[in-house]
């Protein structure tokens, strides 16, 4: 099972069942600061309750990592000692895949044996999940576009978002050069765009995360549609462009209709942002009902067309019609007709 992870926030949530969610925290283990994820949770897979304890334990492998005996050793160790923190797996952190452990062990154990050491039992590979039969992470399974210079800042008590220093090339960018096209909130727009999420939210902050990325932090108030679970808390909306379109300002109460991409909620130019009005709640629900009805009708037509094509196969083309055999009646009549005798020659 491919697990595509794009970590751009840390949410400290409380589960609906009344159990307190374990909070995510920034990775402080020096060996793991350049991993594709910047947030972790404790206890880790080796039962260390704090990162301070994990730091003391992972230090024993620093020399092994430095000699670069395996390209996946650092990844494997960090996945064990500083497991990635995600909203879906707060109470059961994701483990590294068995294949990652085996690669690290097979690469490094020969060197360890030269110094009379074996692969430690605490890092045994046998109990780890197999890639295609469980949830696990490997270097190939993580999709990330976060550069190495990303750092994390605490915006609110509930979340963390990335901050990145501007390059010299970004300084010329100005919102005044962007001309956003207004998307009208109509039924026709909704049916044609087929948005994957619709929410009522309040804009908390808008900040540029780089030359071609703008992060809009919103406080989700109502969820009318979603293709994956959306927490009722503050979440980031990502605009992967130098222009923030549609253009919105902090403290606005809005209806947002847009798309999800690689598990991230996007805010794109063809999305709809409308100042909130109470009637928008009922209207968006009605539009979604019409969209579902339209999709069912389209699906029914496809099924009918498929059944029709199977029951009425096309006639073969390119063959000349076969000549019709002679009528049996005509043949019988021809056979039964008396033969005419020739007149006898007269004798003299």
Swiss-Prot record:
GO term, biological process aspect, one: positive regulation of receptor internalization
Domain FZ: 19-139
Signal peptide: 1-18
Stretches for region Disordered: 289-348
Gene responsible for this protein: Sfrp4
Protein's recorded name: Secreted frizzled-related protein 4
S-S bonds: 24-85, 32-78, 69-108, 97-136, 101-125
Any one GO molecular function term: Wnt-protein binding
Record-annotated NTR domain positions: 178-296
Keyword Calcium belongs to the record: no
Entry keywords, A to Z: Developmental protein, Differentiation, Disulfide bond, Glycoprotein, Secreted, Signal, Wnt signaling pathway
Annotated compartments: Secreted
InterPro entries reported for this sequence: Frizzled/SFRP, Frizzled_dom, Frizzled_dom_sf, Netrin_domain, Netrin_module_non-TIMP, TIMP-like_OB-fold
Domain notes: The FZ domain is involved in binding with Wnt ligands.
Glycosylation sites: 38, 68, 116, 194, 240
Tissue specificity remark: Expressed in the involuting mammary gland, ovarian corpus luteum and prostate. In ovaries, low levels found in granulosa cells. High levels in corpora lutea of pregnant animals.
One GO CC term on file: extracellular space
Induction trigger: Up-regulated 48 hours after estrogen treatment mainly in the uterine endometrial stroma. Induced in ovarian granulosa cells after 12 hours treatment with chorionic gonadotrophin (CG). Further up-regulated in corpora lutea by the luteotrophic hormone PRL.
Bias-annotated ranges (Basic and acidic residues): 289-303
UniProt function note: Soluble frizzled-related proteins (sFRPS) function as modulators of Wnt signaling through direct interaction with Wnts. They have a role in regulating cell growth and differentiation in specific cell types. SFRP4 plays a role in bone morphogenesis. May also act as a regulator of adult uterine morphology and function. May also increase apoptosis during ovulation possibly through modulation of FZ1/FZ4/WNT4 signaling. Has phosphaturic effects by specifically inhibiting sodium-dependent phosphate uptake.
Short name of any one Pfam family annotated for the protein: Fz
Family: Belongs to the secreted frizzled-related protein (sFRP) family.
Sequence ranges of Basic residues compositional bias: 330-348
């Amino acid at each position: 099972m491919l697990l595509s992870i794009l970590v751009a926030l840390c949410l400290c949530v409380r589960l609906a069942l009344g159990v307190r969610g374990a909070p995510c925290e920034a990775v402080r283990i020096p060996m793991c600061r350049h991993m594709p994820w910047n947030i972790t949770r404790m206890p880790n897979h080796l039962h260390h309750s704090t990162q301070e304890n994990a730091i003391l334990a992972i230090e024993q492998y620093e020399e092994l990592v430095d000699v670069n005996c395996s390209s996946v050793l650092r990844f494997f160790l960090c996945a064990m000692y500083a497991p990635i923190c995600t909203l879906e797996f707060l109470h059961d952190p994701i483990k590294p895949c068995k294949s990652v452990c085996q690669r690290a062990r097979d690469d490094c154990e020969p060197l360890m044996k030269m110094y009379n050491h074996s692969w430690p039992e605490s890092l045994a590979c046998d109990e780890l999940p197999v890639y295609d039969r469980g949830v696990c992470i490997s270097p190939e399974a993580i999709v990330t576009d976060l550069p190495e210079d990303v750092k994390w800042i605490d915006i609110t008590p509930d979340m963390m978002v990335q901050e990145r220093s501007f390059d010299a090339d970004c300084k010329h960018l100005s919102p005044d050069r962007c001309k956003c096209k207004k998307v009208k909130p109509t039924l026709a727009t909704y049916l044609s765009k087929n948005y994957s999420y619709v929410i009522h939210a309040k804009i908390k902050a808008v900040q540029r995360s780089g030359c071609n990325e703008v992060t809009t932090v919103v406080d989700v108030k109502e969820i009318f549609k979603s293709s994956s679970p959306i927490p009722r808390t503050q979440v980031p909306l990502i605009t992967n462009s130098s222009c923030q379109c549609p253009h919105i300002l902090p403290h606005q109460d809005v209806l947002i209709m847009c798309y999800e991409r690689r598990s991230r909620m996007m805010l794109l130019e063809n999305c709809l942002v409308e100042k909130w009005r109470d009637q928008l709640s009922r209207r968006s629900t009605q539009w979604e009902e019409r969209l579902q009805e339209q999709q069912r009708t389209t699906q029914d037509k496809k099924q009918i067309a498929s059944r029709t094509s199977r029951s009425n196969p096309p006639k073969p083309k390119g063959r000349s019609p076969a000549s019709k055999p002679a009528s049996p009646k005509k043949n019988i009549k021809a056979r039964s007709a008396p033969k005419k005798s020739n007149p006898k020659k007269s004798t003299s």
